[in-house]
Amino acid sequence: MWPRDFSERLESWAQLRQQCQTLDSEPALIKINTWWFQAPWTAYHLHWDDQQDWPDPWQLLSDNQYCPVARGLGIMYTISMLDREDLQDCRMIEYQSDNLVLVSQEKYILNWDPDQVVNISLGRSKPRRQVSQEQIKQKIR
């Protein structure tokens, strides 16, 4: 169940990061993906055209509105704050009508399915837009 108020969301998010610190990469990514899919969904909150104005992780949790872009951003913030050597190459892409988080040289795809992290080829199509983990880390500082 998604935490109701901001302080509970902060505590739950901190616990998530702490738990994922010691898990192998795939179980950690599944746990992160599952946690963010519990967030209350809204059709539109953030847009790629407004990337410069995207909230930092604390504002994202405070806003408590999660469209697919916002949920992907939350996943990216979570992975980035783990600062794990094996999870240093994630990026969020706009691919067709989806906003996906790709990790470990696209081995894992998050923000696609609530119950699993998928491992499929996206083919040769180029993403329309993307944001790297390094760009996301700039919002955390």
Functional labels for PLM-detected ranges:
Residues 1-141:
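A structural boundary/capping signal
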